[in-house]
């Protein structure tokens, strides 16, 4: 049985151990799928990279400003964890995990994924939501065991997201921060109208 969660945890923690820049106030777990992303005979696969933002990066933005919380304004200097081009071993392991768990049709999307008000209610392409669940477990473990607070000297949120903040990204972010570490992020995004 593949302990994929533990593999991701070890890789993420090893990278975060190298982060020593001052002023880090948020960690990005960027999980994104795109039809251009391909692995073997699959397309529209999900990738995963991590990064962070600092107070200096957001140039003194107020606590609830978009510049502080919207990833579009961040430095976006990601380190890939799962990527078919840059981290093929982890991508292969992900696909082995999919197979082991009976997840098929990777990358396919349901055409009926919007409600009557045209709100997206789908879970992304097949495999994306399942990967988000593992990543939120990893983030929650980092928070619950006190690693984030010990390493950075304070509680900071781990934000799980794509280019947009879909309902499942917000769900994953809430699970990832079990002690309310992301409450300010959630409130800011609601005030900005970026999430319902």
What are the functions of these language-model segments?
Residues 1-13, 124-143:
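Well-ordered, non-membrane alpha-helical segments in soluble/globular domains
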Residues 1-32:
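Short N-terminal edge-element motif at the start of the domain
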Residues 8, 12, 90, 94, ...:
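Generic structural signal of hydrophobic/aromatic residues within well-ordered alpha-helices
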Residues 20-65:
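N-terminal interaction modules that seed assembly of large macromolecular complexes
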Residues 56-127:
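Low-complexity, serine/threonine/proline-enriched polar segments
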Residues 64, 69, 131-139, 158:
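Generic hydrophobic, helix-prone segments enriched in Leu/Val/Ile
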Residues 140-196:
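Glycine-rich, aromatic-bearing surface loops/beta-hairpins
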């Amino acid at each position: 049985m593949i302990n994929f969660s533990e593999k991701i945890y070890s890789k993420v923690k090893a990278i975060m151990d190298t982060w020593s820049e001052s002023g880090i106030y948020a960690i990005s777990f960027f999980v994104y799928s795109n039809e251009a992303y391909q692995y073997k005979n699959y397309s529209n696969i999900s990738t995963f990279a991590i990064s962070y933002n600092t107070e200096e990066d957001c140039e003194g933005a107020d606590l609830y400003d978009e510049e502080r919380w919207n990833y579009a304004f961040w430095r976006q200097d990601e380190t890939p964890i799962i990527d078919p081009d840059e981290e093929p071993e982890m991508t292969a392991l992900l696909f082995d995990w999919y197979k082991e768990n009976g997840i098929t049709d990777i990358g396919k999307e349901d055409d009926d994924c919007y409600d009557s008000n045209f709100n997206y209610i789908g879970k992304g392409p097949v495999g994306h939501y399942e990967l988000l669940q593992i990543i939120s477990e990893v983030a929650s473990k980092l928070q619950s065991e006190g690693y984030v607070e010990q390493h950075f000297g304070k509680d900071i949120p781990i934000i799980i997201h794509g280019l947009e903040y879909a309902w499942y990204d917000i769900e994953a972010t809430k699970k990832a921060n079990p002690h309310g570490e992301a409450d300010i992020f959630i409130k800011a995004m609601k005030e900005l109208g970026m999430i319902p």
